[in-house]
Amino acid sequence: MKVLVLNCGSSSIKYKLFDMDSKEVIAQGGIEKIGLKDSFLKLTLPNGEKKILEKDIPEHTVGVEFILNTLVSPEYGAIQSLEEINAVGHRMVHGGERFSKSVLLTKEVLEAFAACNDLAPLHNPANLKGVDAITAILPNVPQIGVFDTAFHQTMPEHAYLYAIPYELYKKYGVRRYGFHGTSHRYVSQRVCEYLGIKPEGLKLITCHIGNGGSIAAIKDGKCIDTSMGLTPLEGLMMGTRSGDIDAGAVTFIMDKEGLTTTGISNLLNKKSGVAGMMNGSSDMRDLEAAVAKGDPQAILTEQMYFYRIKKYIGAYAAALGGVDVILFTGGVGENQATCRAGVCEGLEFLGVKLDPEKNKVRGEEAIISTDDSRVKVVVIPTDEELLIASDTMAILDK
């Protein structure tokens, strides 16, 4: 059984082809710069070697077609024929309140998903383009949608509503939805397998820290709160996003700088966070190197970054009534020991004791707390694509 997983962004398509009998990735890659002159497909061959194939890719259907042709090509192919693809699983960003679990993509489902376009104007239309492309090229292959917002739909009303006129929620759906749900769900399930424990009774805080970052409070396997909101702009300080900011500061900046809503959105989403503090660079590795050299601006930026994560962990320990496991995932969470150490420093009052030696781990599953730490601190690399493929299989098996 082979499942193709697609993640279509506004100008990119990432893909992985899974052999679900062995849960192995047999082909993977991505297209970047769709609609621009220098678009290309970067793929990883089975031996780990990376290849770049340049091609003019004006829009998503051409991109999907290029990926499918590459999958069956004599030179780079992983399968003999496209008929070997049994199903396609799509990462769908914003399912609004309608979708609390993964579903077969029917005409009705796609119409309901398109109705959420206002909530994710960059991502949702791109997700739909991927679905349309598969429909055009492989019309008989079932397609499954896995929603980034779905896992957080178990949040109680008092956690997801904003304290603004209630009619704005009723009219426009203005509330907190949360994102990275597929990642939070994957690691929350995987950590139970890894530690040999049941989700029932477990108080878990999952920290997905990458260029974007979010934290989730998970009780009995269900999300009760998460740091991102109506959009991915709320919450943590991120690579280029501000995270939490006083709404009054937003209108103040708009007045002073003469910014439109598009202008302020651009400033807060693309020019803030680490990049805003570090003159445009959002790479945490650059920040770490600058801190090591003693750059005072870098040291301040890192303190701000760690502090915001730590503050959310404290808040979620309160929301959960305690915490049993703190989990790190995402590009930074999985690979950067300094980030994990900086975040956990000062959390001793919660029962957190980090083991400096164990914390040196990079990109592997590991317990990084001491044996006598009351709270287990764990690293679990995320695998959203595997979860999308697994959901796809589960729905087909029904």
From Swiss-Prot:
Substrate binds at residue 91. It catalyses: acetate + ATP = acetyl phosphate + ADP. Keywords: ATP-binding, Cytoplasm, Kinase, Magnesium, Metal-binding, Nucleotide-binding, Transferase. It is an enzyme of class 2 (transferase). It comes from the Bacteria. Its EC number is 2.7.2.1. The keyword Transit peptide does not apply. GO terms for cellular component: cytoplasm. The active site is at residue 148. Mg(2+). Can also accept Mn(2+). It holds the Pfam family Acetate_kinase. The record marks 180, 241 as: Transition state stabilizer. Its main location: cytoplasm. ATP binds at residues 14, 208-212, 283-285, 331-335. Mg(2+) binds at residues 7, 384. Its cofactor is Mg(2+); Mn(2+). SUPFAM superfamilies: Actin-like ATPase domain (SSF53067). Pathway: Metabolic intermediate biosynthesis; acetyl-CoA biosynthesis; acetyl-CoA from acetate: step 1/2. PANTHER family: ACETATE KINASE (PTHR21060), ACETATE KINASE-RELATED (PTHR21060:SF15). NCBIfam families: ackA. Homodimer. Catalyzes the formation of acetyl phosphate from acetate and ATP. Can also catalyze the reverse reaction. This is Acetate kinase. It comes from Bacteroides fragilis (strain ATCC 25285 / DSM 2151 / CCUG 4856 / JCM 11019 / LMG 10263 / NCTC 9343 / Onslow / VPI 2553 / EN-2). The gene is ackA.
